[in-house]
């Protein structure tokens, strides 16, 4: 395997991984669990300091196994019963008794959450105290990327700046990567080297089934399924994509106790990169090798596009994740590389105005809408229709990606600020 392809695999394995619960509150749960481990006993007080974007994405989403929303319950349960060795699955084995104990801490005013001014989009600092010690853990740049630990105000760990970058914001820095090189890697790599990505199907389809079998959030997936059964809607590949992606997000945002295979720190974006591709593969009876190659396009393509702008912003990441999924769907349908590029152009043209106003139950509607856009855009591309030189869409897919990055990075910070202030008021 050439060295560049090895870098691609490292990227995928670095930011496509299982996550239980929305990753922003889970970040606080993880930091609190590590702080408690440092204390050696359960804390009496917990102070949580987070960036505005982490705050925004934690306000309205359920924390798994708690039946509650927000950073306070996430941090408290992480401290009381979280497993610091489990990363994004820190709350996988939380019990009802531990949730009750965590809630008592909150009810007694012992858990305080504050916004902190920082240039980092993903930032969480937790200070946990007992009668003897205080422990401080700082996460910055990635949901589990600890950059510093302090015990009794003494620094006991600082991240070595010479180590390879592992944050979502920097994951593609210095890597020779383009849509064309991703396509070549996906279609030419040895199957044994990429088959690990198939776990995404197992996890995210299981999450979709959970969302269809049980009432979570707005029940977007279940509602569409019921209306097909009533005859109001027709069953089709398009409806299957909408139902399964929405149902998975329903469960994800509703606090289901199943992990999602995340993408770039987001479970919903992992769903968007996975389920439409699975449904397209099922339609064409694609084998595991073909599906794995399509997953490389959707997951690595999404990571590459999103590396052009901050990991948390006023822009809904499902919009461009679905563009990469559309690329993969064209491949599964037997389309050309040029048609795959057209699918990306078409999807971004359709979804580029979708804002992020926090993680919550309505994400299921956005995930479903983005997935349907991926399908629509793939069909247009397969019929040689491509949006070009219109609005932010350039005459070349790489230029379009740069335009989107510019729009979000320089054009949307004020929008993000206003969204957060509206939500906090």
UniProtKB/Swiss-Prot annotation:
It comes from Aliivibrio fischeri (strain ATCC 700601 / ES114) (Vibrio fischeri). This is UPF0597 protein VF_0641. One of its GO terms (molecular function) is L-cysteine desulfhydrase activity. Belongs to the UPF0597 family. InterPro entries: Ser_deHydtase-like_asu (IPR005130), UPF0597 (IPR021144). GO terms for biological process: L-cysteine catabolic process to pyruvate.
